[in-house]
Amino acid sequence: SYAQKNHFANLRRYSKENAALPQATKKDKRVIFMGNSITEGWVRTHPDFFKSNGYIGRGISGQTSYQFLLRFREDVINLSPALVVINAGTNDVAENTQTYNEDYTFGNIVSMAELAKANKIKVILTSVLPAAAFKWRMEIKDVPQKIKSLNDRIEAYAKANKIPFVNYYKAMVVDENQ
């Protein structure tokens, strides 16, 4: 139906794939990658890497941390993974769903980490990838500074809570202002 296809969090996006997964056992080392178009594209361009490692991609293009949080139970908790890799924030900064508020975005990321831990799911947090601007939202100002500030908070939270942190930003940035 129209409502299902256009639901804010797109909860049904992976419903068939989720239903087709066998029930996870304690021996399983199921890993879920939760993200946006970056994650979705990675799965699409490297399906063998995901399949051969037992990795499950749950990226939806254009989504923000608000939408990730709404679908976290469906696409992560209910699948009983051993580990979830959370990559969130790019589309928040791009204001894809609302005016950017770093505290809200950071809070959504923390909430996902807390939900995972409460369900005995290990967490890896990642940085937001570098961007100088967003071609679909050129009016957004100070993009590099906003990304760096959010990344600093995610990294500090990860360190304080002994959560592994993968710094994609550091590996990919060409210039701090780009």
Task: Identify what each model region corresponds to.
Residues 34-36, 86, 166:
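Active-site flanking residues adjacent to catalytic metal/cofactor-binding acidic residues
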Residues 37-41, 61-65, 90-94, 129-134, ...:
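Solvent-exposed loop/turn segments at secondary-structure junctions
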Residues 85-89, 106-113, 117-126:
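Conserved, well-ordered alpha-helix/loop/beta-strand core segments that scaffold catalytic motifs
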Residues 129-178:
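Catalytic His-Asp segment of secreted/periplasmic serine-dependent ester chemistry enzymes
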Residues 2-82:
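Serine-esterase "nucleophile elbow" of acetyl-processing enzymes
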Residues 57-60, 90-103, 137-143:
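Surface-exposed cleft-lining segments at the edges of enzyme active sites
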Residues 101-110, 144-150:
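Charged helix-capping and loop-helix junction motifs
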